[in-house]
Amino acid sequence: MLRPLLLLWLWGRLGALTQGTPAGTAPTKDVVDLEFYTKRLFQSVSPSFLSITIDASLATDPRFLTFLGSPRLRALARGLSPAYLRFGGTKTDFLIFDPNKEPTSEERSYWQSQDNNDICGSERVSADVLRKLQMEWPFQELLLLREQYQREFKNSTYSRSSVDMLYSFAKCSRLDLIFGLNALLRTPDLRWNSSNAQLLLNYCSSKGYNISWELGNEPNSFWKKAHISIDGLQLGEDFVELHKLLQKSAFQNAKLYGPDIGQPRGKTVKLLRSFLKAGGEVIDSLTWHHYYLNGRVATKEDFLSSDVLDTFILSVQKILKVTKEMTPGKKVWLGETSSAYGGGAPLLSDTFAAGFMWLDKLGLSAQLGIEVVMRQVFFGAGNYHLVDENFEPLPDYWLSLLFKKLVGPKVLMSRVKGPDRSKLRVYLHCTNVYHPRYREGDLTLYVLNLHNVTKHLKLPPPMFSRPVDKYLLKPFGSDGLLSKSVQLNGQTLKMVDEQTLPALTEKPLPAGSSLSVPAFSYGFFVIRNAKIAACI
């Protein structure tokens, strides 16, 4: 039953189906009918489906890890819980743990201010320290981006204090930490040298830390980054070696994820196949990365293109096909993803316009069976962050927060009737049962309108007779789609104070209303009292 539904949905998404509006409905192109498939669940994703990353580049100069002690930053991260926090990225393979390295003065200042009995309740970073780091951050960010563009990466070391800072951030933000280990530490015969990982495991074990692990980042690009070529067979054997280390340590029950490959193109797919053959059994979920565009050349039109959005489908299908063939039943995660690679697209990836890519990727991932999607990056260098250098939440943060509050892990299916559905994209889940306003059986519909006119959506019977809560997001200010401020139902979203998120207030619609979605906007509609058995 599910396979025919999936084919129907995919054909509709790619524009192959051209059903007309049913007889008796108004022949206007701006009023559209929806179809819901709610008899059974289509997919089920993790409660931590929407997760986040901290790029390993933040530890290049460990002083800047002190940012993670900010109560404001932690409050923003806590809003996205439950979630995984992945510490990884290109610099993963250029970071070396030095247990004898002394903490930086900034780190030392932070730890001296802590109450060891209540580390999450007492954390305060000196305002002077934060101000100094924020003044220096633009220069550090330029160094990191230049290193990335020039592909000239240098090894850096991090201390026990750096690990403590990262773990403290995850724990106090109620996130589950996934730590990426350096895979480019090699013996002369190119096997993985696990000695540095062993030092880190020993330290984390002594502290009682609960951590999951990865090994390496985008191994398909090792030659470009370090002039070292590792094939999938060797990489699989390296993961088996890491798994053995974990089994001999306090981390015998820890999860292991990988191989964090890049886009699924020819040689990368070949690497994945041989990796899964050699090491597929020891990973708990398969991880891969996706970006739509090159951040240096991406345009506003690209960010609003349904054709660009649809390219993601084919990438997912390639990954799922290989996974099913080599390791049937293995869960697949998007271990790192955003709009554009290379740190994002300036003046685009941190604006309202980026939300179309982000929300659509979440919808497609859930529909296609990706269990977890890790957003690059929560905070850090580049333009694709959720929170900026002043700890101000950006449009994609607010979009992520709404998704967390309203969207549950049980996935259903919705479809727009009629032709040209690619610019009006709809997704349907059971509502998050932990939202105090809603109950089991309610539905959450989320919608993206890429048309330049308002679209009026008509719910199918019997849903059209149910009350609906609207959560519509629109840009605020004269910058329009390039704005870094967002309004929810006409109210600008901003933090109440340093540690308090605003209320996300619904706009109730009377039963029988059409759902109006203005041009170039997106939002959520919670259908109350839907009483869908599959959601209960």
From Swiss-Prot:
Signal peptide interval: 1-28
Region (Required for heterodimerization with the heparanase 8 kDa subunit) location: 281-410
GO-annotated molecular function: heparanase activity; syndecan binding
InterPro entries hit by this protein: Glyco_hydro_79, Glycoside_hydrolase_SF
PTM: Proteolytically processed. The cleavage of the 65 kDa form leads to the generation of a linker peptide, and the 8 kDa and 50 kDa products. The active form, the 8/50 kDa heterodimer, is resistant to degradation. Complete removal of the linker peptide appears to be a prerequisite to the complete activation of the enzyme. N-glycosylated. Glycosylation of the 50 kDa subunit appears to be essential for its solubility.
Main location: membrane
Biological processes per GO annotation: angiogenesis involved in wound healing; cell-matrix adhesion; establishment of endothelial barrier; heparan sulfate proteoglycan catabolic process; heparin proteoglycan metabolic process; positive regulation of blood coagulation; positive regulation of hair follicle development; positive regulation of osteoblast proliferation
Catalytic residues identified in the record: 218, 336
UniProt-listed Pfam families: Glyco_hydro_79n (PF03662)
Protein name: Heparanase
